[in-house]
Amino acid sequence: MHTFIEPLILYAVLFLRVSTVAALSGEAVEFSAVAETVRIVLYNIPSLALIWYLLLKVKSLKEWGITLPGKRDLLPAAAALPALMLIGLTISIVSRFFTEVPSGSQFLPPQNFVSWSILVISCISTAYLEESFFRFYLLSKREEMGLSPFRAVLVSTALFSVCHIYEGPWGFLNAALSGILLAFLFLRYRSLHGIASAHALYNVLVYALSAV
């Protein structure tokens, strides 16, 4: 049981929180460059630093099986991005036939170059934060926690989905399906950078498409 203490504390402190910026169901939320910058500096970066400190305190990157970004990350990234887009598009289409199901908050795209630049940095840092914990950290520690690969994927996906519950039922479903995909790709290719880059680019594309 003690092997679950650190992951649970990390999850509770870093992810299991009530978002103070989440709007009511269906409400539009304007992009704030200042608020996003504050979130990057005071939340994303310190959270990433904590996760990696705990990981590197035990093993080196090489021992964890993680290398610097390279060609080996291209295949998982190329597999993840279109699959994430397909999941998002399918849910978007299906949700239109179930108007009685409440929708999540609508996050509006940035309006200028500076704001878009901040958004890109935010998407990259957020993707690396989520992939570092939900895929790299949890799945790498599955043996220590006595979990089979399949059960580890379920645990990782469940925790990841709960963090997106503020996006409504469809956002929760999107996170669940995407979480399963990213978890299996990480287990198959052991590529943190591949899935993180696909995750980040997907989030940027969602904003870009909403601006069209």
Please identify what each model-predicted range represents.
Residues 18, 48-51, 58, 87, ...:
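Alpha-helical transmembrane segments of polytopic integral membrane proteins
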Residues 74-79, 116-120, 150-155, 172-173, ...:
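Hydrophobic alpha-helical transmembrane segments
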Residues 162-170:
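Membrane-interface helix caps and helix-loop-helix hairpins in membrane proteins
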